[in-house]
Amino acid sequence: MKKKILIVEDHHDCREILGLLLTKIGYHVIKAQNSKDAIACAEAEEPALIFMDMELPDVDGVKTSAMLKQNPKTSHIPIVALTAWMSELWRKKASKVGIKTYLLKPVSSQTLRETIEEFTDESLIRANAV
């Protein structure tokens, strides 16, 4: 069974390219363009991992991630930040709300696959749920 990956990205082209890359390497892709859609998709689809853009139009990626981590239905899902830049301040904020790591755009399909496999390992998920 293909792992479900949720892409939260407000830029249509970035969202589509990332979706194509992930589909091509064997993942089932779910897409959201803002915070509200991200939360609804995460609750309904229960993805194995979320790639979260940090600059969303309604609520930024850090706050959206915090909402997902506070929600019992989605708190166990690993979140990886996707961003064109990451300052030390943003890195600290992201870490505080439970974002596992960040990837700088553009990102290769190999990096995507390695990140997904690293953060969707079953033993890691169980350890993080405790």
For each feature predicted by the language model, list its residue ranges.
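The feature encodes the CheY-like receiver
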Residues: R15, P57, S75, S87, ...
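Active-site beta3 strand of CheY-like receiver
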Residues: E45-F51, L56
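Charged docking surfaces used in two-component/phosphorelay signaling
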Residues: E16-K24
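Alpha4 helix (beta4-alpha4-beta5 surface) of REC/receiver domains from two-component response regulators
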Residues: G19, K63, M86-T101, E114, ...
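Acidic catalytic/metal-coordinating carboxylates
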Residues: N34, D60-K63
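Conserved acidic carboxylate
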Residues: E9
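Short amphipathic alpha-helix used as the core "switch/output" element in two-component signaling
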Residues: A40, V62-S75
